[in-house]
Amino acid sequence: MTGTDDAKVLFGVKKIKEATRGNKTFVLEENLSSGGAGLFSIEIIIDSAKAVEIIKENQWKSAKSFADQCYAIRIKNRENNKTFYVLAGGGTGGMYGALDIAEAIECNSINKLLESDNSPYLTKRGIKYNIPLDLRTPTYSDPGDAHQQNIPDTWDLSFWQNYFDEMAVHRYNVMTWWSLQPFPSMVKVAEFPEVALNDVWRTKEKFDDTYSSLGLNFDRPYLFQNIEVLKKITIDEKIVFWKKVMQMAADRGIDIYLFTWNIFTYGATGKHGITRRQDNDTTIAWFRASVREMLKTYPLLRGIGITSGEGMDNKQTGEYANEKWLWKTYGEGIRDGLKNQPDRKFTLVHRFHWASLNEIQKEFKDLPCRLELSLKYAIAHMYSITNPQFILPAIPLLSPQTQSWLTIRNDDIYSFRWANNDYARSFIRNIPAIEKVAGFYMGPDGYCWGRDYLSKLNNNKTPQLIIEKQWYSFMLWGRLSYNPDLPDNTFLQHLPQHFPSINSSELIKGWSSASMIFPWITRFVWGDIDLKWFPEANLSHPNHKGFYTVKDYIERVPMQGSNIDGILVWASNKVEGTKNNLLSPLNVADTLEILSNNSLASLQKLPKPIHQSHGELNQTLSDIQAFALIGKYYAEKIRGACDLALFDKTKIESYRKNALQHLQLAKSFWNQYATIYSTKNKVALYNRVGYVDVEKLKTNVQQDIDMVVKWKPGQNQLIPNGNTEVPFKQ
């Protein structure tokens, strides 16, 4: 098929061979695959000049582009022979074209494969991965079970190989590693020799839900009193390891970026005089030297992302003000690192978080590489509405020269499998001014997108990767961000490969309905950041509200741009006989019930799920049922809150009676949901919302009913609640 030694193309060829072996219609023999329909051959060209020559020879339509990631597929038909040409200007485009052909073979649609010209809609399509390195160099999410469980996987080459393979198949081309700061686990700095860390540590002690949401005090002494050494490895061996990992990524067309929060000195505190103080010149020198060494040590590192917070002293002024500190450390460190490699392509991504554009541009004016920005696109909830409004104030100040990344946070769905083509396509299509968008990275802060240690059903086997478990949603977001015009069948054709024995049309019908339940409840409840709202458990961090009560529902202000009325305003208007053009809370409840009923109706036509079975079909059907049940819970809870609000305003007892009826129904749905959820998933500690134990939360569900029974109209202060952090400052 190809004579190239390009690793990316060879991966595409490997996937073609795997697809052919798995499809009895085709028998691959070197350059030919043969079947009942005739002979098939595949040519992959990754030289633009040669590709143009072949196009002219065959009098084909010219390819639109041979730029990076672009490719054309052309087809030559002869008697009893069809040749597919993948024509590209480089290895990534060649790989993507080969993957198209592999997919067509696997899904029995090779005879339907058409000629095409392909180029990325969004040029950078990434994963946000809070990387759990070591007890001594934590990430933002380390006080949570998933990150602690995934530390050993971080140091396993096969983990990364599988991860990058899956990313490439779904057309992701950026991996962003997020750490409070990783330097002691990744580089040696000659000026600070005591800082570099050998071995990999994990505590045997338990974290709890009392840890800071700002990344502070993750080095409590008790954690170090009982440690386990997960891997004996020197810093030099670590460097070799990370070079191999970055090469693996490059071999799948994936760029590595490293993101940090600031100022954190875990692993270095107390050595050579290093402290967290912002005015400590030794700390500044260490950061600068560490950044320099990251660039010198890892030539495949594509960029560094930085955050002005959460551990910075915003009261500092003068030479130690936040942006000046970041320039002295990261800006100067990058300048040092690029001094002897001025032609290297490198990017500094400065997050808008707690920073302003004017200050960033002022302090980083002498940066010797590309400067890009980053903005929280939907704050922490990508599964809310398809057109978040928060970027709009920034758009006039951005340009193709001053682009922003989109942080697309998924702190909505940790355990479930999600599938809704229309939502994902609309979300991507609605991104405004894409010429001003550098790309996106997608992922959670409150969960680890490594291996699935949450499931109870791993049968003592190595847990599967989250990207494998949630393959359909990862496929949607990756493929549609490369090409949002892909037809639905691109995705639907994979369902019979995963679930050969069932009605795929009925499955996706129910699955799609179920997958809209969290977007609807999240846009209504709207807790902007992750610690304020987790829809799998109607929960926020205990220091915020904990479990959302029926009173809390009355007070919620829905998401900006959702066009939904909050219950307080709706109840006042109803009592006063006035109207507005917003969707009422009862419309939201009705929508949730319809989505749930549609999901359950589809399940009636499919095999009954066995919730304790680890098989993919059973677990997918089980997820759909769980979505539907919590959707019904949310519908009845909203109705109960509406009636309680009317009772509070009117003192009419029938409203209280109605509220109680709705909340009793909500309780029954929660109990059914909790049975399924707890059958599938362990009780877990999450760094952003604390412990999630849906069985234990039955007590809180009952307390809603008790609250309504005791409610005295007019004696409860009801205050609208639902502020959103400002993701952009000029």
Language-model features: locations:
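C-terminal non-catalytic alpha-helical accessory regions
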Residues: 212, 444, 448-693, 700, ...
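A eukaryotic intrinsically disordered, low-complexity regulatory tract that is acidic and Ser/Pro-rich
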Residues: 688-730
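Acidic, contiguous N-terminal accessory segments
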Residues: 1-79, 111-112
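Feature activates predominantly on carbohydrate-active enzymes
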Residues: 60-282, 299-300, 436, 441, ...
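Aromatic-lined, polymer-binding surfaces characteristic
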Residues: 257, 261-284, 297-304, 309-312, ...
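Extracytoplasmic/secreted proteins, especially bacterial periplasmic and envelope-associated proteins
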Residues: 8-11, 15, 19, 93-96, ...
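Catalytic-core regions of glycoside hydrolase
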Residues: 51, 106-108, 129-130, 150, ...
